[in-house]
Amino acid sequence: MDFSERVTTLVPEGAYFMLAKAQALEAAGKNIIHLEIGQPDAPTFANIAQAGERAIREGHTRYTPSAGMKNLRLAIAQDAGKRRGLTFTAEQVVIGPGAKPFLFFPTLALVRPGDEVIYPDPGFPTYKAMIEVAGGVPLPVPLREDEDFSFDMQVFDRLVSPRTRLVILNSPSNPTGGVMPQTVLERIATSAIQHNFWVLSDEIYARLVYETPAPSIATLPGMAERTIICDGFSKTYAMTGWRLGYGIMPPALAERVELLLTHSIGCTASFTQIAGLEAVQGPQENVEAVVAEYRRRRDILVEGLNRLPGVDCRKPQGAFYVFPNITGLGHTSDFIAEYILEQAGVALLPGTSFGQNGEGYLRLCFANSLENIQDALERMQSALKKLR
């Protein structure tokens, strides 16, 4: 069939591709430990699930405004502002079914054909896809392992030009777990003001940090008016299947993004939004407990990976991923990922699922039980001993 250029460059996400392979092996009788998909292993917290169930029983199953229910927008504005030391209004908040619309729609609203967009590589695959759909020119900036997988600022400075329209940040990062330091954010902010570009800050993992909070570029002088914050409920509140996210941006841009929602998605399910309201306004002890458990799993996984021959793993500061360097194994990331799946029954992702600069790395998700993580380490150790 003859398709438009907007879709001919799109490719599947590597995580779903690997999941399909792993499930095929499971269907054939092989036991698989799944460390490839980035979603919490715990169910949605009980108070949130109960709020959603109650909303359905009470008849909250009708359309809502495209930008979301006003009480939820206000609650998010207050909560997100308090956590960042900023003041947001409800008019700056737009609600959608998941966080991805707030990667995609601001890009569609801002990027013109031929505009250049700088994004992290390795990084979330949707970044490059949405830039291309918008007609922009994607320019990858490498992440430096020796600087906690922060931007290579020498490359970044070379990429910035009068054609730069948007820079995408992700901190804490998928796939690396790296947190961008304040000094790097300050350099990017200075460049944004000097060259007059926007920043799209993907902060979906902002609550999942293990040592110190992840700073937001929106807090720096002159940046609130040129920053879009993308966040959501999936990772923090174990609500991946509920599909609830939001963007925070200047009101004029929020109006345009709302129009894109109106003419595409329509609105977000009302009962999902009511569950989200409980998530924001209800007790946060479950989040704190989950973060503490993730920290414990992270430490055990990193220690175990560093005992494997040819593997070197930095301790991530946020998110729930590790991104070990496997160049010492002498094979490509794709080969090692396939080998571990077939020989060890452990599903994980090659670094190249996140861009060309992911070569030499693997991504493993530790949002899984400690028992499975320890079993996976034992299986990997056994399999790698046989590697030629």
Question: What is each residue range found by the language model?
Answer:
Residues N71:
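Active-site proximal helix/loop that lines the substrate pocket
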Residues A67-G68:
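Short beta-strand to alpha-helix junction loop
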Residues Y63-T64, E288:
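Short, surface-exposed loop/turn segments at secondary-structure junctions
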